[in-house]
């Protein structure tokens, strides 16, 4: 399984989350299998989303899409988001 971690400055969380929720079908169609949303404990305007993805290639295509870029601008994301492509190596019990 591949993962995509996006780190972005989202500004007003509720506004951003509304746009995020409306983008669900696009994420699914692009290969996303779901996500977990985190907020930086030291900076509530910094949000991190960890997506589970079919494969890294699909995740890369998603991050390069004009649709994602437009939705990020509309939702209030400021600055350039950071994208990290991850492969799970091992899962431990603790």
What are these regions (language model features)?
Residues 1-66, 70, 78-94:
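Short S/T/G/P-rich N-terminal loop/turn motif that feeds into the first structured element of a domain
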């Amino acid at each position: 399984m591949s993962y995509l971690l996006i780190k972005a400055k989202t500004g007003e969380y509720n506004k951003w989350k509304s746009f995020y929720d409306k983008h669900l079908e696009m994420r699914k169609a692009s290969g996303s299998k779901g996500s977990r949303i985190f907020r930086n404990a030291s900076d509530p305007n910094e949000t991190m989303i960890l997506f589970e993805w079919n494969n890294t290639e699909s995740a890369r295509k998603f991050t390069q899409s004009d649709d994602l870029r437009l939705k990020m601008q509309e939702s209030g994301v400021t600055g350039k988001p950071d994208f990290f492509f991850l492969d799970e190596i091992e899962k431990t019990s603790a």
